[in-house]
Amino acid sequence: MGLRYSKDVKDRYGDREPEGRIPITLNMPQSLYGRYNCKSCWFANKGLLKCSNHYLCLKCLTLMLRRSDYCGICGEVLPKKLVFENSPSAPPYEA
């Protein structure tokens, strides 16, 4: 779900990846100074998105996008297109 592109996008881009997409990370590794957290709320540490030099959770990203197209922390343009780095897995189908 969500990993395939529509026919219109395939016709436009072919096999190459559409530009401007940023990866969303489900599990962040430990850094030298501890866990990665959302720079806005400081609570979320899963499902983080990279915004220039810091990370944001989906909730804070949505709230910031409602106000403006620019990040309230760093002033850069907020990311709008997402790509999952690890595709979700499902158990094998057994008939």
Swiss-Prot record:
The RING-type zinc finger ranges are: 38-74
Where is the protein situated, by its record's location annotation?
Virion; Host cytoplasm, Host perinuclear region; Host cell membrane
**In which domain of life is the source organism classified?**
Viruses
Q: Which GO terms describe its molecular function?
A: RNA binding; zinc ion binding
PTM characteristics: Myristoylation is required for the role of RING finger protein Z in assembly and budding.
Subunit: Interacts with protein NP; this interaction probably directs the encapsidated genome to budding sites. Interacts (via RING domain) with polymerase L; this interaction inhibits viral transcription and replication, Z partially blocks the product exit tunnel for the releasing nascent RNA product. Interacts with the glycoprotein complex; this interaction plays a role in virion budding. Interacts with host eIF4E; this interaction results in eIF4E reduced affinity for its substrate, the 5'-m7 G cap structure.
Q: What is known of its domains?
A: Late-budding domains (L domains) are short sequence motifs essential for viral particle budding. They recruit proteins of the host ESCRT machinery (Endosomal Sorting Complex Required for Transport) or ESCRT-associated proteins.
What's the protein name? RING finger protein Z
Protein's organism: Whitewater Arroyo mammarenavirus (isolate Rat/United States/AV 9310135/1995)
Q: What is the lineage of its organism?
A: Viruses, Riboviria, Orthornavirae, Negarnaviricota, Polyploviricotina
Question: What's the encoding gene here?
Answer: Z
